[in-house]
């Protein structure tokens, strides 16, 4: 089929990456795929590059703190404060020490897809800083070992229905019943590397009969 007018997300709408190459194959790590028109807001958001996000973030962030106030990591008691990372991007982009707390980001994308009223890219900023820290071989060292959820957490949880609506997926949120259809492919190829670590070692050879 022709997917030139569509974008394909591997996994969920929040953390799933946008596939750049559709000539790959399904592995045991794949949970599902979301196919949306290329002009869909979510596809456009996921298509944003580091350079594009950097320029927009520097010019439009109003330091409203909404990204931090709704951040799941922050609400659990961690020192993850996306609005400070946005500030660092604008005023101290080369200060590696100030970028350390970006390591606490779990890349859930709530700040980027829901919280920010200006439609900016706080999560991408954290990804940029994580890349900088990796290149500089700098690791975040926590100053605390015990964390306690902030008292405001129970009032700041995001309703899933509201999130689906904000993502523009309400029209696509419909039952997907299991199908009993049996597929009979002519050829099956199994990658020996579908996980972290060394590739798997085949126990059969080319031409062997496998039931």
Model feature map: region roles:
Residues 2-45:
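Catalytic cores of enzyme domains
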Residues 145-205:
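N-terminal, Lys/Arg-enriched amphipathic/low-complexity engagement segments
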Residues 69-71, 205-210:
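Short, well-structured beta-strand-loop connectors
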Residues 36-58, 68, 73-148:
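Ferredoxin-type iron-sulfur electron-transfer modules in oxidoreductases and energy-metabolism complexes
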């Amino acid at each position: 089929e022709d997917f030139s007018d569509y974008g394909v997300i591997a996994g969920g709408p929040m953390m799933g990456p946008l596939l750049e190459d559709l000539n790959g194959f399904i592995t045991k790590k794949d949970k599902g795929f979301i196919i949306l028109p290329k002009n869909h807001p979510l596809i456009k958001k996921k298509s944003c590059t580091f350079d594009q996000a950097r320029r927009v973030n520097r010019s439009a962030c109003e330091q409203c703190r909404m990204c931090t106030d709704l951040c799941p990591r922050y609400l659990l008691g961690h020192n993850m404060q996306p609005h400070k990372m946005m500030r660092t991007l604008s005023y101290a982009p080369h200060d590696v020490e100030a970028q350390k707390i970006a390591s606490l980001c779990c890349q859930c994308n709530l700040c980027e897809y829901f919280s920010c009223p200006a439609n900016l890219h706080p999560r991408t900023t954290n990804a940029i800083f994580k890349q900088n820290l990796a290149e500089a071989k700098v690791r975040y060292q926590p100053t605390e070992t015990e964390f306690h959820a902030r008292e405001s957490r129970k009032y700041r949880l995001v309703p899933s229905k509201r999130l689906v609506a904000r993502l523009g997926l309400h029209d696509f949120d419909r039952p997907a019943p299991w199908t009993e259809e049996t597929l009979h492919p002519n050829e099956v190829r199994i990658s020996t590397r579908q996980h972290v670590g060394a590739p798997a070692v085949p126990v059969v050879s080319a031409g062997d009969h496998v039931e």
